[in-house]
């Protein structure tokens, strides 16, 4: 199929593409060029209400559709994503600024994997039963909630959009989904793919717009019974404050200030390779990035020398150039925020070991938003730079002397999303993993994902878990039936 992209995107509601009721649009900017190359609907509560009505109409039939038939449709969506990988990857890169090779190798394949995984998973999602000897039998039904809201971020647009939508649909719900207004293209194209795959009208409704206008309306709508959100902790706090009095189910995957704990007995070459990825992958715009690098003191200077040498050779360039290792920052606002964070780090006494500046390219990217990969040392644990999420190509490095000190430093954060531990001592790895306050721990690797496992954070990094059975439980209501005999 040919995924044509119009200049003016439209909402996907009730199986149709329609403009915003207000007639208002927002500019869509390519971060690599700084140029406007399209417009998206500036949707509001009225558009959301139309989407909810379409979802309510579709829900009775979709909720009882046999899982074998749901599998066929959801698996077809996965196949069409694979078939259109080139077009989807280019759209993702133009919207987000990430290197095209990354969109092709990671983002789009993962989007199809999300649909394929939950298409299969729902067929094995079993109800529970408990027999009370000679008294009674209990069985627990897992039934779809109804209409749910899925709000996704701009850093991994289609990857995380489908991570929410696929299990929600598989569980029998109808969805009102809002992609980030900064990266709307692949969400728009997903609507076309779902239509082609035979997803019934109204089962998935994609409404574009800003958080205050559109996202707020989704959270506040009385007929939307659950909200799955990925984004900043501040936005998550606001969503929780709005949704809690309405008793909505909430899944909030929020920020992180993740420690990368490196002991001197690790596999050195593998650690360096993966630490480059975990520090600067997707320009550091991944909530799981290890932005606080904690090193055993005996390895500190050697690591610093090799790390700086590698980082200085990371090519920052046009995302369409296959030689570019680092692409553009997603928006001018975020670009300016990151540069301001680097200035604050200097004011706090940090030493810039590498990077720290905007990058000025030539040609089509002359007005794009590019920043050098940046390494900072000499900061205290409690300073703003080490405590607040920057969400960019910026890492700090700090030494530690003992295992206990490493754990204390790792836990010195209001966040608790992820952590990475590097050591060949399996006993040490288990001790540290048990004590680090994070929902996801990687040992001698980073971002190795099994979609069957729980995904989510502790402390200010969120509420609830996604992935596997956890997310299917979230998107269903448990009903216990007790029969006495």
Where are these regions (language model features)?
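Hydrophobic face of amphipathic alpha-helices that form TPR/SEL1-like repeat modules
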Residues: 1-32
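Residue-level signal for inorganic ion chemistry
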Residues: 15, 34, 70, 92, ...
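Conserved C-terminal structural/oligomerization subdomain of aldehyde/semialdehyde dehydrogenase
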Residues: 33-39, 224, 261, 315, ...
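Glycine-rich loop-to-alpha-helix module at the N-terminal edge of alpha/beta enzyme cores
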Residues: 35-125, 135
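Short, well-ordered beta-strand elements within core beta-sheets of diverse protein domains
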Residues: 37-43, 58-64, 150, 260-263, ...
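Structural signal for hydrophobic packing residues in well-ordered secondary-structure cores
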Residues: 59, 63, 78-85, 89, ...
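Rossmann-like NAD(P) dinucleotide-binding subdomain of oxidoreductase/dehydrogenase enzymes
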Residues: 127-270, 400
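ALDH superfamily catalytic-core signature
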Residues: 226, 234-380, 443
